[in-house]
Amino acid sequence: MSVLSWAFTVAWFTLWMLMLYLTNEMKLKFTDAAAIVNVFAGVSAIGHLGMQFLVDAFIGHFWMLCLSTLAFSFGFGFLAISASPILSGNGQKGLFYVALTVISVGIFGRSISLGVFTEDQLEDGRNKGNPAKLVSFVIGNVGNFVFLLLAAIAMPQISPWFVRFTIPSGCEVLAMLIFISGACSYKRVKPGGSPLTTVFRVFMASASKMSCAYSNNSSQLYEKAECDQDIKPHTSSLRYLDRAAMILQTESLEQQRKNRWKLCRVTEVEQTKSVIRTVPLFATSLISGIVFSLGNTFFLEQANHMDSKFGSWNLPLPLLLLFSEAARLGSRELCVMAAKRHAIDFPESPKQTKTPYGIPVSIILSIFCCSIAAHVESRRLKVVSTQGLLHETVPMSVFWLLPQYILLGSITGIYENSFALYLEETVPEELSQYMVLLNVGVCGVGIMSNIALVSLVGSVSGGKWFQDTINKSRVDNYYWVITVFCMFNLLLYFIVTYRYTVCNKKDGATQENDRRIIASV
């Protein structure tokens, strides 16, 4: 499995520099190039949820890894052909877009299955205490770190872009052959169905009973008394979903139980309610997605027009990504440590009242990140103006961008980890992964929203803020606009969490006074 991770690292660094290919080689306006990158990143994020459903319900992780590796191999192969001298014009552009579409399948397939499949192998009873497996795991992690450094340093040194795109394709083919060679020894967990089906069933059952009058008598709601699963108490919120558990008087209970799409347990209804209650918090992910979209678009374009020398050495731009990734991993560890300390200090704290404190921290850091980026860009543009360097590299060190990249990595790590921990505490365990992926999808929508925001701001500014190149534009003003949006996002977070806390308190009071009579089977 390590070879798949190593190949993914090479692909990751190659895709991170896609903005430079579009502006330097295809000669696109930097806003058009950013739009293409944002659509690609957004689609790659949105597809996670649907792919997770396919993996759980039909495919399984082994075959998903095979599919994702094939997608990477063909996708980068198409990308290499589109960048080669043999193609030009519409054929080149068409194949380029096809390549990105195929690669996006590889991204969300690999992201979903690689970690889970690796854990399955480590937890396999045949491998417990096996020194060879442990050594292989350690070598895999060390090798991944080495590949990070090699990819960051070596990839930018390769001049022809079609060669840069060919290397990830070759790595994926090699990784596929090595991965398949051990297929007989892998532990494979068969797809057991998706827990998301429960949510669909509740919506379908409640919709089928829309014409039925709702009764406040909770004794008319169905629950399976001898079920091995935890039984969740009935709550008063989102009452329209309670119809899914209503026992109709026109049919016998035995007949209704046979159709699971028309009668659900109260516990299943309450699980669906817990999912819906967290959805408003996802609104904060839209603006966070806009901030995330800057790292491999506008920030990278700034770096491309700045002095990257460190002494006599030309600093490879992907090293900025390494600093950002290090900040992301470090901030995630801090979040985990803070969560453990909170659990020790406040063991009696009920899960329903916990709020994701890491999210407002990440939003505050977003405000700092965008404001710092605005100040740095203002300084850079001042150098451009005073020295007349509209078409030249600006004699200003790329290290000026380091704070905003480190902040961006910290924001990503804190936000992702805080949201994941929060969802683990507030939604059923089997659905928490889907909610995490739903949040990733909403972030993807936010990333693509950057396109609309750039278009809107460009129209309002009369085209002065966004011109052909970043040296002629006023991206610093755009960063200030995003800073204001982040401030609004912080206010939105407090409104949503306050509303969520109030609703939970009402549900808690209702549970004490609204005891149902369980319909025994």
Swiss-Prot record:
Gene: NPF5.5
Alphabetical list of SUPFAM superfamilies matching this protein: MFS general substrate transporter
PANTHER family: OLIGOPEPTIDE TRANSPORTER-RELATED
InterPro entries: MFS_trans_sf, POT_fam
Membrane topology, from the record: Multi-pass membrane protein
Principal location: membrane
A single Gene Ontology CC term: membrane
Transmembrane regions: 3-23, 35-55, 62-82, 96-116, 134-154, 165-185, 279-299, 310-327, 356-376, 394-414, 440-460, 478-498
Domain of life: Eukaryota
Keywords, comma-separated and alphabetical: Membrane, Transmembrane, Transmembrane helix, Transport
Location in or out of the cell: Membrane
Name by which UniProt lists this protein: Protein NRT1/ PTR FAMILY 5.5
